[in-house]
């Protein structure tokens, strides 16, 4: 038991109450000091460093609005659609809560995509922050699962058929696919059993995992310290410190960055509320018009597409056709040949590469392209987990990389946006070809990163962070 701290009898009531709690639960106060008031962050944070806090804010909005929606929602195939309409029409302020939740889902992905992009350009996945990045990617994967399961709950036409299409993709997995799809659906078609399963996962299981990953992400971040736009370590063994041992290039998170984030939150909430009140459907991108029609298992919509934040990966799924498989085989053979003849390695390893390439090519010839589309869609997310070990650049931040790296990253962003656009559009010959090129570029960006990230002469990295006082 820790020794109680004494306080002056003349202290204010606030100080006395604070001292009373601190004597009885000192761990909470220690955590506040470690993670907020005495957590030193680099003093040169910029615009890109607001999105982590905004992601936490949106997570809270989603949890709170979700609780109120569950009070009135009926997870029954015969009642689900009507219960959503009841929330919108008869529950006091139900329309506002529903629009906050639906807009919050899209806002969550906006801030998470921007947060991940900041990590990409500033090298926040590099040593010693590999675990921070891995936990972040796990959060992204968990968020996708949460959004997909919640997407079915309104039980509209697009929800129903979107879930039908995605769940059927699991049936393409050799040997276990049909049984796995049946397990996920709980029936031979998407129905009441599927709705109940997705509801339980969306409301209980996935949020618990998501919250655990968020805590792990923050703990890992605060243990190794935040990165900064220069990619310079402010808490390393050679970093300058003051007499108290605090980094000279750091400032306490509170009050400096709490005020910084409060301003960002204010701007974000103005945009967020403007969308809720004036364009909650966002032209059919946040809430699809087909979802205002009750689910009809006997009537398939003309065009089935996922919500906008899944569309880049949906484009990659559609890009893998039987014709595309031959291009992928050429890539596999070419990659194996390049590895064997370009790099020095033991003969045994060369043999293993040849065997692996032969197995992959044989699998591509024997297994349907639909399965490889699923692999591409999943692999597009999984490959992000390996980013810390793919980047061989001598510098972290894009600021000090060769200029052509910036153009490459810009092309990557444009390619991702184009894939997202194509995923919303109905299939077409031109769209298919463009999405195939975009898919090859997406994977080539990461797979070839160990090679292209070394090319070029980086600019000198400063010993300390660059900071100009405002």
For the regions a protein language model found, what residue spans apply to each?
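Membrane-embedded and interfacial regions of multi-pass energy-transducing membrane proteins
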Residues: 2-107, 111-470
């Amino acid at each position: 038991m820790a020794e109680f701290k004494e306080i002056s009898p003349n202290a204010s009531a606030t100080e006395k109450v604070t001292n009373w709690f601190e004597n009885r639960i000192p761990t909470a106060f220690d955590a506040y000091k470690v993670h907020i008031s005495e957590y030193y962050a680099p003093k040169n944070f910029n615009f890109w460093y607001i999105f982590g806090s905004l992601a936490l804010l949106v997570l809270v909005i989603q949890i709170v609005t979700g609780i109120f929606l569950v009070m009135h929602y009926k997870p029954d195939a015969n009642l689900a659609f009507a219960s959503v309409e009841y929330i919108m029409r008869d529950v006091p302020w139900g329309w506002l809560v529903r629009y906050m939740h639906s807009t919050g889902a899209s806002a969550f992905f906006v801030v998470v995509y921007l947060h991940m992009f900041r990590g990409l350009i500033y090298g926040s996945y590099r040593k010693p922050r590999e675990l921070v990045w891995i936990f972040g990617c796990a959060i992204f994967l968990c968020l996708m699962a949460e959004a997909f399961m919640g997407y079915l709950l309104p039980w509209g036409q697009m929800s129903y058929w979107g879930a039908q299409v995605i769940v059927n993709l699991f049936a393409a997995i050799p040997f276990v696919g049909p049984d796995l799809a049946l397990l996920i659906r709980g029936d031979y078609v998407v129905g009441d059993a599927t709705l109940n399963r997705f509801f339980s996962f969306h409301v209980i299981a996935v949020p618990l995992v998501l919250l655990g990953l968020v805590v792990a992400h923050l703990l890992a971040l605060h243990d190794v310290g935040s990165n900064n736009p220069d990619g310079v370590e402010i808490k390393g063994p050679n970093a300058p410190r003051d007499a108290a041992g605090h980094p000279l290039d750091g400032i306490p998170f509170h009050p400096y960055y709490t005020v910084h984030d409060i301003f960002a939150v204010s701007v974000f909430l103005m945009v967020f509320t403007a969308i809720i009140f004036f364009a909650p459907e966002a032209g059919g991108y946040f809430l699809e018009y087909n979802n205002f029609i009750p689910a009809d298992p006997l009537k398939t919509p003309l065009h089935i597409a996922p919500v906008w934040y899944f569309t880049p990966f949906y484009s990659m799924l559609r890009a893998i056709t039987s014709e595309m498989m031959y291009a992928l085989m050429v890539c596999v053979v070419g990659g194996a040949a390049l590895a064997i003849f370009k790099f020095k390695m033991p003969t045994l390893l060369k043999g293993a590469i040849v065997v692996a390439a032969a197995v992959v090519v044989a699998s591509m010839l024997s297994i349907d392209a639909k399965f490889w589309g699923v692999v591409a869609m999943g692999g597009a997310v999984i490959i992000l987990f390996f980013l810390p070990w793919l980047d061989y650049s001598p510098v972290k931040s894009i600021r000090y990389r060769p200029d052509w790296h910036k153009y490459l990253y810009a092309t990557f962003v444009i390619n991702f946006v184009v894939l997202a656009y194509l995923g919303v559009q109905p299939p077409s010959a031109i769209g298919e070809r463009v999405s195939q090129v975009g898919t090859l570029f997406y994977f080539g960006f990461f797979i070839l990163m160990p090679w292209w990230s070394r090319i070029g002469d980086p600019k000198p990295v400063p010993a300390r962070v660059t900071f100009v006082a405002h």
